[in-house]
Amino acid sequence: MTEQKQVKKPSARRRARECTVQALYSWAVSGNTAEQVELAFVLDQDMDGVDKPYFRKLFRQTIENIETVDFSISPYIDRTFDELDPIETAILRLAVYELRFELDVPYKVVINEAIEVAKVFGADESHKYINGVLDKIAPALGRK
């Protein structure tokens, strides 16, 4: 009898975070407005299993608060935003938005979700970088 590894489907919120990272990436590199990116994303992407209202909230609110989010990140990264991989930037922006504004989400959940998203979309070791940066930011935001 062969054992089959059971693949766990990501939660609706994790899928919302994955979609938010993809949309933030697209917004940053395309030069399109947030509204254009969101509309194109919802029309073009598979949104099955996604907490759509949470996706919309995360995407819109992260962009609405981008200056505050970036200001919270910049002291804790070892390079400029221009030198960061755009996916890492999108993951950090989403996580810092959640750490700063979504206080009902435990900080450990925010950091773990960011790490898991980085494992899916980031370079080989980017999840370690994301973890290190967020471990420094969380206490600075009063979340540890």
UniProtKB/Swiss-Prot annotation:
Gene3D superfamilies: NusB-like
InterPro entries, per database record: NusB-like_sf (IPR035926), NusB_fam (IPR011605), NusB_RsmB_TIM44 (IPR006027)
Keyword DNA damage attributed: no
Keywords associated with the record: RNA-binding, Transcription, Transcription antitermination, Transcription regulation
Keyword Hydrolase: no
GO cellular component terms listed in the entry, alphabetical order: cytosol
Pfam family, one: NusB
Example GO molecular function: RNA binding
Signal peptide: none
Any Gene Ontology biological process: DNA-templated transcription termination
CDD domains named among the record's database cross-references: Terminator_NusB (cd00619)
Family from the record: Belongs to the NusB family.
Function: Involved in transcription antitermination. Required for transcription of ribosomal RNA (rRNA) genes. Binds specifically to the boxA antiterminator sequence of the ribosomal RNA (rrn) operons.
Protein name as catalogued: Transcription antitermination protein NusB
